[in-house]
Amino acid sequence: MLPVVALVGRPNVGKSTLFNRLTRSRDALVADYPGLTRDRQYGQAEVEEHPFIVIDTGGINGDEQGIDVKMAEQSLMAIEEADAVLFLVDARDGLTAADHGIADHLRKQNKKIFVVANKIDGIHGDSAVAEFYSLGLGEHVHQIAAAHGRGVTQLLTIALTPHIEELGKPKVEEGEASEGEFDDAFFSDKDVELTEEELAKKLEDEPQENDKIKLAIIGRPNVGKSTLTNRILGEERVVVYDMPGTTRDSVYIPMERNGREYTLIDTAGIRRRKNVTDVVEKYSVIKTLRAIEDANVCLLIIDAQEGISDQDLSLLGFILEAGRSLVLAVNKWDGLEDHEKDRIKTELDRRLGFIDFARVHFISALHGTGVGHLYESVEEAFVSATKRISTAMVTKILDMAVFDHQPPLHQGRRIKLKYAHAGGYNPPIIIIHGNSAKKLPMSYKRYLMNYYRKSLKMMGTPIRIQFKDTLNPFAGKKKLNYTEQKKIARATQGYKKD
């Protein structure tokens, strides 16, 4: 699961600036105005190839009133959700009563806390941060200037890296999506160094076709997740009970359909009391991301009345990054006019054309229209993701693909693809070996992926293709002249000179 790091501190200490620096984005609004961040922002960052989730929160002063109370509540809950906390303080303002209050709260949490003194540019850092050691939160106060990036790299590599490595395993920016933005989710040029024993163990641990299906219902707030979950459970008339899962704050609901056992991962909180405040609903983002990691199949719900939003694309990006099988459900379909339905279908083709492997269903969770057909696609996606494929089969398909369409030239030489084998399941991973295989253009990589999908009849699951260059046995060896070659030939043939 992806580790979670929360940025916490007083208003205007630079949390949003650091958030943008870590996520390499401008998702968080930044201005010299206290309280600008009201809702929590979520983004993905990476340190030494270890991804993690960053939460930007509103500031905590201790004397909040009105809407500021809600902001403070969000910040406190962010601390509970996080695996580690970056406690930001202002080196220019010095230690304040609000800092002491936040520190008192953090001491009660069983979290890894890092004190980060921001805005050290233009001042003597060591002198300015000395008083923050009195907070008693760790041995170090990390000095940074988030606006200029000073000290941020050291903060990541020295402080965060060891803990991120321990906490989790396996970016999607908001905005208009295109095929190229998600290519990394399907293709990899990293060398695969598994031994046969390691590969066999890896494949044994993968889910089998007849296993339970862990189905996570994913979507933005108010798209109908709770309604659909209730519809699914109501149709099956199962006894609903809470089964605590390994993923924090998710509820696992066992059910059965047509002889297949399912575990429905509820991220919508359908059993919460009606008087739960709206603030609590805003904390479902972390639950959703962790449910994606734990699921076999993700059912992504899109609101037909609002169309495809940036948040939909972000959730889709997390699903693809995790390699999970995918089914799309466009909800609230029955309330649209014909011209609106045509507009939504056009938008789906335009913005989500790169996930043509996913089945799309147009449903009404409220009335149950089309809900029953979702199971067929979920089952199909799971079976495709867990289908066992032999080395002989994937190599034969590779030969057929190369015969139908030769790889392009690279530096005047034809790229040769030699053989392929399975590297894992859920999602299916195919490893292709060849000379200069990593030099294949993206267009040919997509051709191979589509060829494999069609040949293996896989729908509903992404296919990841990894390329590995075959070592040249003559690389690095000295080229011999004719006389030297003749001497070696005589020696190997037992020729003796008189």
From Swiss-Prot:
Gene3D superfamilies: 3.30.300.20, P-loop containing nucleotide triphosphate hydrolases
Keywords associated with the record: GTP-binding, Nucleotide-binding, Repeat, Ribosome biogenesis
Listed InterPro entries: AAA+_ATPase, G_ENGA, GTP-bd, GTPase_Der, KH_dom-like, KH_dom-like_a/b, P-loop_NTPase, Small_GTP-bd
Residues in KH-like domain copies: 387-471
Domain EngA-type G residue range list: 3-167, 213-386
A GO BP annotation: ribosome biogenesis
GO molecular function terms attached to this record: ATP hydrolysis activity; GTP binding; ribosome binding
Residues that coordinate or bind GTP 2: 219-226, 266-270, 331-334
Pfam family, one: KH_dom-like
Highest rank taxon of the organism: Bacteria
Residues noted as binding GTP 1 in the record, renumbered to the chain: 9-16, 56-60, 118-121
Entry's family note: Belongs to the TRAFAC class TrmE-Era-EngA-EngB-Septin-like GTPase superfamily. EngA (Der) GTPase family.
Function: GTPase that plays an essential role in the late steps of ribosome biogenesis.
NCBIfam families (alphabetical): GTPase_EngA, small_GTP
Subunit structure of this chain's protein: Associates with the 50S ribosomal subunit.
Protein name: GTPase Der
Designated gene of the protein: der
